[in-house]
């Protein structure tokens, strides 16, 4: 059972994500990105082996309340998982570059290619996923690897040193056919930070 602090970036998918996590027996504590960062940091300190999960949301990482500062405060200390806007914020907080995708993807099902490792091990290749975004990662930060892509677009990244990963697509969407299994594998991978 994982202990997850979920930062809600005011997205309609947030509670789909919460439901899937709770269905896998995870404890999920939710804070909106407008909450004072010190309140969130104090909560993290009280959680045993916390995983910070960053929800999807509108706009850009810079406009997502305390999210960027929160990542900068806890990176390297606890595992972090980001979805869509959360993924973009991870990339930006670690020094990567986010830019416009050139088109808007809203409810688009795409077949992505992945590396078959860690959270993607045993999943279909290519993997059908749901995409809702207008921004993408243009340059990954140091110590990150690209572990999935669609054409030339980065769809996910992973940092094996800090146990941080981000997904441009939505594992919690019904259009991501193996999404529940992928989320379970993501949480299992992030939890490895506390086993080493």
From Swiss-Prot:
UniProt cross-references to SUPFAM superfamilies, sorted A to Z: Class I glutamine amidotransferase-like
Keywords, alphabetical: Amino-acid biosynthesis, Aromatic amino acid biosynthesis, Glutamine amidotransferase, Lyase, Plasmid, Tryptophan biosynthesis
Residues binding L-glutamine: 57-59, 88, 134-135
Presence of keyword Ubl conjugation: no
Enzyme class: lyase
All residue ranges annotated as the Glutamine amidotransferase type-1 domain in the record: 3-196
GO-annotated biological processes: L-tryptophan biosynthetic process; phenazine biosynthetic process
Superkingdom of origin: Bacteria
EC number(s) from the headed UniProt entry: 4.1.3.27
GO MF: anthranilate phosphoribosyltransferase activity; anthranilate synthase activity
Catalytic activity: chorismate + L-glutamine = anthranilate + pyruvate + L-glutamate + H(+)
Active site per the UniProt annotation: 84 (nucleophile), 170 (for gatase activity), 172 (for gatase activity)
Pfam families cross-referenced by the UniProt entry: GATase
CDD domains: GATase1_Anthranilate_Synthase
Protein name: Anthranilate synthase component 2
């Amino acid at each position: 059972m994982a202990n997850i602090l979920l930062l809600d970036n005011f997205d309609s998918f947030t509670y789909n994500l919460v439901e899937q996590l709770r269905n896998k027996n995870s404890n999920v504590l939710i804070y909106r990105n407008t909450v004072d960062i010190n309140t969130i940091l104090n909560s993290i300190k009280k959680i045993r082996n916390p995983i910070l999960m960053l929800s999807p949301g509108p706009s850009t990482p810079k406009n997502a309340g305390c999210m960027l500062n929160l990542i900068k405060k806890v990176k390297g200390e606890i595992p972090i998982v980001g979805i869509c806007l959360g993924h973009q914020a991870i990339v930006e907080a670690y020094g990567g570059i986010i830019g416009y995708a050139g088109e808007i993807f809203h409810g688009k099902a795409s077949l992505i290619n992945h590396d078959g490792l860690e959270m993607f091990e045993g999943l279909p290749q290519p993997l059908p996923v749901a995409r809702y975004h207008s921004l993408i990662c243009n340059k990954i930060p140091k110590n990150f690897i690209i572990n999935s892509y669609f054409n030339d677009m980065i769809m996910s990244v992973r940092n094996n040193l800090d146990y941080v990963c981000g997904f441009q697509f939505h594992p919690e969407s019904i259009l991501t056919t193996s999404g529940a299994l992928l989320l379970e594998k993501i949480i299992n991978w992030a939890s490895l930070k506390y086993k080493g």
